[in-house]
Amino acid sequence: MIRNSLTDVFFAKDDVENLHEGVLRVLSKVGVKIENDEALGIFEQHGARVENGTVYIGEVLLNKALQTVPANFELQGFDRTVQVGLDHDPVVIPTNGTPMVLNFDGSYSDTNTDDLVNFYKLIDTSDVMQVTSEIAVDVPGLDKTKDSLLAQTALLMKYSHKPIYNILGATIHNYKKGSVAQGVRENIQFAKKYYGYDDKYVIYSGTCVISPLGVGWEAMDHFMGFIKENQPISITACSMTNLTAPGSLYGSVVEDAAAILSIVVLSQLMNPGLPVLYTSLSSMSDMRYVQLCMGAPEFALITLGHIALANFYKIPVRVGGALGDAFKADYQAGVESFVGLMAPMLSQSAMIPHGCGTMGSFNLTSYEKFIMDEETIRYLMRLRRGFEVSDKRKEKALKDITKVGPRGNFLGGRTPKEYREDNYLASEVFNRKGCKENTREEQGDIRDRARKVYDARMEAYELPDTTLEQKKLLNTELPEQYKFDI
């Protein structure tokens, strides 16, 4: 298995300490703007300096908060749990929040509720996705004359066996019967009631800080609601170099880390021991087009910088993903996905967001790319596992080599155990059958193979075996066309 993190290739211990020193200076000298009076009062009560809505956090307070951040935690789904944290392999979660879909026929369309259901089924039948999430939010197909916050959560729950990541935030547009803060908590309480647990982590969520060095009022309402309801939070930075972050990658990492840590500290002051995820989706800007570039190599470098810092702070880190700037499931999309997935997969990461399907700088998701990205993840999981080097393996291999000798062959009898353990046999998505004319005709294009996998998964999908009470609860919020017949 992997013995050293990829971060060690790029950052020496002194480098990480240098980054940390930069973070401390930003936290204590520049501060973070927090748009929530209650939070400002909590910071002040614990000794932080607060001036005109800006919080200044010193090293002592930071270290105190870091001591209570759990290294690991468990997410509860409908009928399964997932272990997340520093002592586990990365948990892969799907794309979320993309407003457009690239369809199998090559057309583009706005993501709608039917797309949501299709992707929920795809996620639920995935062998690499351990958590599900809203693919997009506030989409066409929802009744916008009504509050749609809980309707979208109910739709996700109906089709999911797996634990859920709730990218959906309460807003003044999808929750009108009260404040945003009330909507956040009602959504969480709905999830607790559906799963039947008040003392487990049944829904984790997060939102973005505002770069540079701010946390807006809606984000604060979101964070505060989850902290008070004792559910895990993901604190996300998504800055752009030379626009909302300095031009240097060093500056990008340090600035974002300070903003993320401000909410880590708040969470532990309010609810010591609450699981938090340190999340970065920041990347470079291409100033020729003033465009965020999620497929750039700098995205991987920024990601690795944040992994190194989060590991230094002993906070579970959620970074990277099969992201990119391509708008077709083409060679560019594949390269970008691999670069974005490689950094967290070959290091000590707790979770990988946007694991499958995302492209177009967060604006687009693709059915076929989702299937292809799953195979990329399997390849990287195989790389992460490495291969066994031991006296037992050595003696067996040398015995076989000695027995066969020069110019022999090793084919004979049953396939040996070590072959089955050491070799990953790719799925039908990738071709490994050669390239003769009949093979080319039989295999077709990779998009055709992805479509076959998709169709088989849709046919194999089965709804969770919900109780009558759970069905009734979901029916109170589900969009009309998705209600259970009971």
UniProtKB/Swiss-Prot annotation:
Enzyme superclass (EC): transferase
Catalytic reaction annotation: Co(I)-[quaternary-amine-specific corrinoid protein] + (R)-carnitine + H(+) = (3R)-4-(dimethylamino)-3-hydroxybutanoate + methyl-Co(III)-[quaternary-amine-specific corrinoid protein]
GO MF annotations in UniProt: methyltransferase activity
Alphabetic keyword roster: Methyltransferase, Transferase
Function: Involved in the degradation of the quaternary amine L-carnitine. Component of a corrinoid-dependent methyltransferase system that transfers a methyl group from L-carnitine to tetrahydrofolate (THF), forming methyl-THF, a key intermediate in the Wood-Ljungdahl acetogenesis pathway. MtcB catalyzes the methylation of the corrinoid protein MtqC, using L-carnitine as the methyl donor. L-carnitine demethylation generates the unusual biological product norcarnitine, which is likely degraded by other members of the gut microbiota. In vitro, can methylate free cob(I)alamin.
Family, as annotated: Belongs to the trimethylamine methyltransferase family.
Subunit structure: The L-carnitine:THF methyl transfer system is composed of two methyltransferases, MtcB and MtqA, and the corrinoid protein MtqC.
Protein name: L-carnitine:corrinoid methyltransferase
Gene symbol of the encoding locus: mtcB
